[in-house]
């Protein structure tokens, strides 16, 4: 989890720096939270598909709502500030990529390696 969080935080920060280089006031953690949700959803696909689908669908719906209702949406009212939905999107994408890489790495590690007897 910690390594995934670090990679997600770097992904969000670098993406915002590249995509929105005029944004100098963002201090949130929400992009990382979306990234962790996407990461957990992806890595759970193999052993808990129902849970994974639920997490991914609801995360996707919230991302859609945030991107459509920019400015004075419900999330902005809750936190008393503008919502930087781009951080949510980049966090979720980064988290999903990290999850896919973890699944691929786990799949490669779980393959049976030939022994000396083979």
Stretches found by the model and what they are:
Residues 5, 51, 55-58, 91-98:
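Hydrophobic alpha-helical transmembrane segments of polytopic
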Residues 1, 43-51:
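Membrane-interface helix-boundary motifs at transmembrane edges
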């Amino acid at each position: 989890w910690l390594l995934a969080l670090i990679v997600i935080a770097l992904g969000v920060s670098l993406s915002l720096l590249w995509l929105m280089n005029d944004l100098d006031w963002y201090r949130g953690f929400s992009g990382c939270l979306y990234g962790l949700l996407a990461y957990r959803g992806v890595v759970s696909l193999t052993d808990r598909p129902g849970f994974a689908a639920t997490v991914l669908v609801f995360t996707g719906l919230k991302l859609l709502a945030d991107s459509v209702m920019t400015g004075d949406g419900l999330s902005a009212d809750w936190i008393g500030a503008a919502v930087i939905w781009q951080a949510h999107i980049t966090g979720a994408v980064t988290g999903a990529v990290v999850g896919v890489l973890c699944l691929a790495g786990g799949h490669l590690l779980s393959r049976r390696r030939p022994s000396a007897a083979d």
